[in-house]
Amino acid sequence: MTRRLTVRAETWPLAGVFRISRGARSEAEVLVVEIHDGAARGWAECVPYARYGETMDSVRAQIMAVAPAVANGLGRTALATNLPPGAARNAVDCALWDLAAKQTGTAAWHQAEIAALVPLTTVFTLGVDTPEAMAAAAAANATRPILKLKMTGDGADIDRVAAIHASAPAARLVVDANEGWDLATYLDLAPRLAELGVEMIEQPLPAGADDPLAGAPRPVTLCADESCHDRASLPGLAAKDSETAPKSSIQPSSLLGP
């Protein structure tokens, strides 16, 4: 065995408390995976998500369970049959990509046969707070091209968006309910959000309880997040509504694995 896998926990304080509909946090707990092969070292990290039943301990155990196979040469393709989509597989998969890039001198995007790298516009997220606090945060980030606004369904969401729109009138806006609304809230807010220039609503209803959206009006484009956790989710999503866009996050193998 020439390869060796290690994993360690790191905690990074956030600049402030970050709130969504499910809770709040003031730090990010990550697991860092390193795969050593001779002088080469590939590394990656992941964030376990309680929403999917993950903890730091459970994800660490998943990673260490495949450590012997990785040491014996387990590759990215075979990894998909050894770990389910999730934080653990994401970290090991990305570490293997990084290791191969360093060993061959070929960037990961070349290995993946992506035609070319082009700049992409991403969103800047504002966590849930009072309308006044979110408006101040929006004003401080008014030059960013797209602001994503976390929502809760607590009755103050429309006030939050109105205050943000007034503070950052040039910014494009999307909102993310993180499963925090019900159908009545969606039907009430969607047309009003459209009037405020909101271009997309992400995951308004809970995953597994979003069928009512299939026949609901669409004044704003909808985006699936928690309802589209892996590739197996796509057929059901398409069957519900061909106009719903799946979201892609930075942890690709946790979202689009088999």
What are these regions (language model features)?
Residues 1-173, 178-187, 191-195:
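N-terminal capping/lid subdomain adjacent to the active-site entrance of alpha/beta enzymes
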